[in-house]
């Protein structure tokens, strides 16, 4: 019997839901929605929203946490 893979939990990531981030290179502001899993390989990834355009984006956890984003505010 194959075990179900462990799914990403919010506590697994550096950035919790609703934290506001700034992209270092572009200066854009974003809000973290959740930590999810990419369907193809179940790798953890962040779902986040642009605070300027309200577009939603998905980025692998490793990229999101490599220094290209910094925390600017913690909201509820």
Where does each model-flagged region fall?
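Mixed-charge, Lys/Arg-rich low-complexity intrinsically disordered regions
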Residues: 1-17
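Basic, alpha-helical terminal appendages of large translation-related enzymes
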Residues: 2-6, 45-46, 57, 73
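A short, compositionally biased
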Residues: 14-18, 41-44
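An N-terminal domain-cap segment
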Residues: 15-16, 27-29
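A short beta-strand micro-motif
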Residues: 19-24
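Short beta-strand-centered aromatic/proline hotspots
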Residues: 28-37
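Short solvent-exposed strand/turn elements
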Residues: 39-59
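Intrinsically disordered, low-complexity, charged/polar segments
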Residues: 55-76
């Amino acid at each position: 019997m194959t075990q179900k893979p462990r799914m990403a939990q919010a506590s697994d990531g550096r950035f919790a839901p609703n934290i506001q981030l700034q992209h270092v290179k572009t200066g854009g502001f974003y809000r973290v929605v959740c930590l999810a899993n990419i369907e193809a390989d179940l790798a953890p990834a962040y779902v986040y929203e642009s605070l300027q355009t309200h577009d939603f984006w998905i980025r692998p956890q490793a990229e999101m946490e490599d220094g290209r984003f910094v925390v600017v505010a913690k909201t509820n």
